[in-house]
């Protein structure tokens, strides 16, 4: 059925297409990311050449590199691939928890890898800022709360965050909430503390690091969802949740392809408490209205 949520999705698609050809906006966003990442030598953001740019043309500096799935990447040492993977996941966390500004199109065409003489000089080139989207705490706050609740395996906290996002249909059966909580708790295993909540043994090495390249997590999530018929009780998901899920899946896929071996919890944990009190207050406000 054509619902308000569905119409909001159509409006969002139209807005995304408009932003993709708004070169003034993309140039502004590119400059912004170049500025906030200027002190982080792991990342390269092209420079906008104003002299040759206009409303219809955006001219940038040429930045060399190889594609993420180039065979040369897997020839790098494990340490170097871990360095790259950690950098991309940390960037994802900064977008979600710190900046409220997210690259909503995390396909590999938006990245290049610049291989240095050693891991200290490997860099990630960030391209195409046309799909950057700003979020306010009204919409991203409950999404962050879903991440925190999943990380702590806190089903009640997760339920409140879902309610704040209007995620489920009215009066969902308790079994559905239990099944969806279990799905979220499994989905976050890549960022989970393996000592608290161990994932399947085949995705950990002897040091307790997550084997992203061997992970079959998406398949397990799909199987769990279809097994429990979760989709029967869902409204059209809020677009903000889909953007967040797509962002996290994009980061997961990046680390999966380059076969990183990284404990995700050591990346996520420094960000978990950012905006936490405000996010919890926002969830309470939205669920009590």
Q: Where are these predicted regions, by residue range?
A:
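Conserved protein-kinase catalytic-loop position immediately C-terminal to the HRD catalytic Asp
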Residues: 55, 109-110
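Helix-rich C-lobe and terminal helical cap/extension of kinase-like folds
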Residues: 11-13, 54, 63-67, 71-87, ...
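Juxtamembrane "helix exit" motif at the C-terminal ends of alpha-helical transmembrane segments
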Residues: 35, 102-103, 256-260
